[in-house]
Amino acid sequence: MQPALQPTLYESLEALPEGVTGEILNGQLHTHPRPSGAYVNVGSMLGAELICPFRKGNGGPGGWWVIDEPEIHFVRNVEVAVPDLAGWRRERMPYFPEDQRFEVVPDWICEILSPSTAGRDREIKMPLYAYYEVRYIWLIDPAKRTLEAYRLEAGTCIETGRFADADRVTAPPFGAVSLDLEIFWPPQRPVWASMPLS
């Protein structure tokens, strides 16, 4: 009798239950649950702000695809990342893949940090993105209300800007427009709203 074959990492990733995101980073399967509402809000707001000027060309140069949570295969079925947002210049990726696997390295990636993903995003994914030559990386921390912008230079991520609270963001590769950072942050819950009812 033949021993049962162990599933590949990618087969394990595909078998994850709904609501769990999986990535294969440096040969290990990493999982995390769906994010909180505040975290999702930041990604939605950033995508909305970028789509008109950079995808549609309304008030900006156009020429980009900006996509939420694409499954990026740096190495098909072996090195798989799912960033919160990613962008490609259309001349580099004129068409979408026929399945879920994006195999063209993005020009830009944005990770939205949460307590469960911040360490992985900074310590595993940023070096991986640099290795595969993602030219621009943004890290947004909803809890700290910050945005950090990085550019790849000679294989190293160099910080090009740090923004907080109500700053206006003008950062590569989307420096053609100024983004109002304040609209990304959800309203603060009043203290009384968290108090138990008597």
Label every PLM stretch briefly.
Residues 1-198:
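Gly/Pro/Ser/Thr-rich low-complexity, intrinsically disordered segments predominantly at protein N-termini
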